[in-house]
From Swiss-Prot:
The keyword Glycoprotein applies. It comes from Encephalitozoon cuniculi (strain GB-M1). This is Spore wall protein ECU02_0150. It is found in: Spore wall. Residues 1-20 form the signal peptide. InterPro entries: MICSWaP (IPR031513). GO terms for cellular component: spore wall.
Length: 220
């Protein structure tokens, strides 16, 4: 019979193995109104296309760092299980915005009640410029209103339907990074990198890759 020492070694090996082949799934519901959806379509892209392409690119970058981190035994991939839909709650109107960001905080609380256990991103049809002072005071470059929830392991974000490509991609990337559990804001940046003969290409850069800190280290 195996002794307790060998049993512990076996269990530890099973844990490491499960971490190596498992997936950290982050369920995310993105809400947008018909007017907000039309803003993107008028610019030639659907909101589904934007969220999908950014989520895929962000996953790849995060998982590159997961495998490169020699200090971590948790090699599970991150994966965003995202969905885009219209707002069903009668208490939330994504086409109406208040004088300050307090309205968005209230709506996030309501949305979280309707979608327990899932991170929520609310896309308001208004422009972020009207709230620039609020974000400056909060020390944020990206216009995100954030509600972090412990220990529920889901973080909710309210933001805006910006149609300038780099701006909305930065917004969605940072919002998704927060839904994955990032304790810090503005941790995702887009930059141009030299791609040799092909010229410059746009790439995602992560300013933090210590995923053990995500959601207090207890989620995913």
């Amino acid at each position: 019979m195996f002794g307790s020492k060998y049993l512990l070694i076996l269990l530890a090996g099973l844990v490491i193995c499960s971490q190596a082949i498992g997936i950290r799934r982050i369920p995310v519901e993105v809400y947008v109104s018909e007017a907000g959806r039309k803003k993107f379509l008028d610019k030639g892209r659907s909101i589904e296309d934007i969220v999908g392409s950014v989520a895929e690119e962000l996953e790849l970058k995060m998982n590159e760092h997961v495998y490169a981190d020699r200090a971590s035994t948790d090699k599970r991939k991150f994966h965003f299980d995202w969905n885009v839909s219209g707002m069903t709650s009668s208490e939330i109107d994504l086409d109406k915005c208040g004088k300050d960001t307090n309205r968005f905080q209230y709506d996030l609380v309501q949305a979280a009640r309707d979608k327990a256990g899932v991170s929520v991103i609310l896309l308001y049809t208004c422009e972020s410029e009207g709230y620039s002072e609020d974000f400056i005071l909060a020390g944020q470059k990206t216009p995100l209103v954030i509600q972090r929830k412990y220990p529920e392991c889901s973080n909710d974000v309210a933001t805006f339907t910006e149609t300038e490509p780099m701006k909305i991609e930065s917004i969605i990337a940072n919002a998704l990074f927060i839904t994955a559990g990032s304790p810090l804001n503005d941790m995702v940046e887009f930059e141009e990198v030299d791609n040799g003969r092909d010229g410059f290409k746009r790439d995602i850069r992560l300013k933090t890759t210590d995923f053990s800190l995500f959601s207090g280290g207890v989620c995913h």
